[in-house]
A protein has these predicted regions:
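Fungal secretory targeting signals
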Residues: 1-21
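Histidine/cysteine-enriched polar flanking segments
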Residues: 20-647
Length: 647
């Protein structure tokens, strides 16, 4: 007599429920086939259930939200907690701390099959093997409408076992480098007199993933003005532009004084299959800059029953800011599939960001290291951007073209416009012309800056080197790359000038700033303190580099690169903008020379984006962020849709 595979599986399930005729059997099941439910009637979750692979095996979630902001209420404002107390307190309070189930919607299901014939003395036990895994995993049993914690010594009765157990599993933490890899083997043991049976199922905690630009933006973040008219204008413009892009959620404003909102956290998520689609917990990833207090606020202000947060401890510097983290959208290449895309981060002379290994430990968005040693800030967002597209790949790459940027100025000069102002930005309402000083250079004067053309040729070469890496890793072709004109100059040398001295500014003790801005007077060399800048007043907020510096002596020796040759955007870098919708990008206004009524840089940028089927909305960031060595993207953040499968 022959049986089909399906009939054999059904027979096996029936045998599992027969105790005395065929011996005691125990069966525990999870969503091994990842269809969002546990199959207790068929065989779809039986095969290979004891082994976890990237292609098959049950998933569960780190339940690290903060329902009702219980922890935030206990802590109080982040600025009230002295740094001497350390940052470990942030890890010690979330929904998975202790053995109370505060957020059951993030439990992954486990089921045991009913065992009909058991004596009254039969007992059952469910536990996780491996001490490390057991310390990271929680199991609960449903009793009525409540969930009861199943500890190592918890015993199930014969009555419990006869009906089958409805269990749930969650994790206390995420995958960690050189720590727990997220795997858990759950064992189910039943004993009845002299008989004993055991079974197991393999699971793994879902990875923490970062967003890519094919996922539409759902919320925008920035930092409040705190009575600063410049930041206030930036925020007002951002709110207007986010609404114009169709984003319904109001812009979330942090109240921590750190205007570099892109840099102190990376919005992410973790998800598993559910019966009605992915079950998702948003996860805010703090930058690996433990002395950057603003990073605390993703725990204090953003966590709730649908949002969690994680931190990977370390005292990073500017390349550890999360502006130095972007995500290549999903793709397949050379037999490899990246359904959640891949992360890119810039490295300095082989020194990777401290978060790199944490991201690698998630084992889904295998990070790629690019070269940003030529940039003073060192962020990948300074020269590239991914855009959604209706092409076969689903996305394209936009990159800076410094040679084209210089050529725009040279062409204007050749056509007789060399004496025109190189920077067209006017003073806006509320900007005192003395305090908020604007550069007066002409096009020809900019072109005569020391090594201006050769510097931009070097920048172009370094960008091409990074494009080569992306081509090698993704199969990207030249037809999928769009180049926008841009210019760079030495970050710690004379560039734009302004006839204002520190004594004319609001802070008489200030000294000249790093960046392509200079003020008359003796050179002080590279410095990272607050400055008066040639492109504006004393910069009221910390520069993007200052904000990233570790406090105290921990940062000594970190900037081992040759900073005197490092570059920063000369005109506002339009690639360093925010993708808000599938045809809407918010870019910093470049304020290029105006010839025949048009900003020649803005026009060229718009034409390039139009070829990629995108409309550009420009937003001024000259005084709010550009003079501090950043742009619109650096001063904002976004979280995006999370409904796509990564498994």
């Amino acid at each position: 007599m022959r049986f089909s595979t399906g009939k054999v599986a059904v027979l096996a399930l029936a045998l599992c429920q027969s105790t005395y005729a065929y011996g005691l059997k125990a069966t525990i099941l999870a969503d091994t086939n990842r269809d969002g439910k546990v199959d207790v009637k068929g065989d779809s979750d039986i095969k290979a259930k004891t082994t976890w692979t990237p292609e098959r095996g049950a998933l569960f979630l780190a339940n690290i939200g903060d329902t009702n902001q219980r922890c935030s209420k206990i802590w109080g404002p982040s600025q009230d907690i002295p740094f001497v107390d350390g940052e470990g307190y942030l890890d010690e309070c979330n929904d998975a701390i202790g053995n109370v189930q505060r957020n059951p919607k993030y439990l992954a299901p486990l089921r045991t099959l009913p065992i009909a014939k058991l004596s009254a003395s039969a007992k059952g036990r469910v536990h996780v093997t491996n001490k490390v895994a057991a310390s990271k995993v929680r199991i609960f049993v449903k009793e009525g409408t409540e969930w009861t914690y199943v500890g190592a010594n918890y015993t199930f009765t014969a009555e419990d076992l006869r009906g089958g157990l409805e269990l749930g599993i969650d994790a206390r933490d995420v995958r960690r480098p050189k720590g727990w890899d997220g795997k858990a083997q759950v064992h189910f043991t039943v004993s009845d007199g002299a008989q004993k049976a055991t079974d197991s199922v393999a699971l793994r905690v879902a990875p923490v993933l970062t967003h890519h630009h094919v996922q539409p933006a759902e919320r925008v973040f920035s930092t409040g003005a705190d009575e600063d008219i410049i930041q206030g204008r930036f925020v007002a413009d951002l709110e207007k532009n986010a609404a114009a892009a169709g984003i319904d959620e109001p812009v979330f404003l942090f109240d921590n004084g750190d205007i570099w909102t892109q840099d102190f956290f990376e919005p992410g998520y973790t998800s598993i299959p559910g019966p009605d689609g992915p079950i998702v917990l948003r996860v805010m990833i703090r930058s690996v800059q433990s002395t950057r207090y603003s990073g605390r606020d993703v725990f204090h202000q953003l966590r709730n029953d649908k949002v969690g947060a994680v931190q990977h401890h370390g005292d990073g510097d500017t390349i550890d800011s999360t502006g130095n983290l972007e995500t290549i959208p999903p793709y397949k290449y050379k037999g490899k599939n990246y359904p959640a895309g891949r992360i890119i981060q810039g490295q300095w002379e082989g020194r990777k960001p401290l978060m790199f290994n944490f991201l690698k430990a998630q084992q889904v968005q295998d990070p790629v290291a690019l070269d940003t040693a030529w940039l003073a800030v060192g962020h990948v967002d300074e020269f590239l951007q991914f855009l959604p597209s209706d092409n076969e790949r689903g996305w394209v790459l936009v990159v800076d073209d410094p040679v084209a940027g210089v050529e725009l100025l040279k062409k204007a000069s050749r056509e007789g416009h060399g004496s025109m102002k190189a920077l067209s930005r006017p003073h806006l309402p509320g900007e005192d012309p003395v305090e908020y000083c604007l550069p007066k250079e002409t096009i020809d004067q900019v072109l005569k800056l020391k090594k201006f053309e050769s510097i931009n040729k070097m920048a172009a070469q370094r960008i091409e080197g990074n494009i080569a890496i992306l081509k090698r890793e993704t199969g990207l072709t030249d037809d999928e790359i769009f180049r926008v004109p841009a210019t760079f100059y030495y970050a710690f040398s004379d560039g734009w000038t302004c006839n204002i001295s520190p004594t004319n500014s609001t802070n008489p003790g200030a000294i000249p700033t790093p960046g392509p801005f200079s003020t008359p007077g003796p050179s002080t060399g590279p410095s990272l303190s607050k400055k008066a800048v040639g492109g504006g007043p004393v910069f009221k907020a910390k520069s993007i580099i200052e904000a990233a510096q570790p406090h105290g002596p921990v940062h000594i020796g970190r900037r081992e690169v040759d900073e005197k040759n490092q570059l920063v955007a000369f005109y506002p870098g339009t690639v360093n903008g925010v993708v808000l919708a599938d045809s809407f990008v918010l870019a910093p206004k470049p304020w290029g020379p105006v010839i025949d009524g048009e900003d020649i840089i803005a026009k060229a940028v718009q034409e390039t984006y139009a070829r990629a089927s995108f409309n550009v909305t420009f937003q001024d960031d000259w005084f709010s962020h550009h003079v501090g060595m950043g742009e619109v993207h650096c001063g904002t953040n976004t979280w995006r849709t999370t409904d796509t499968k990564w498994w």
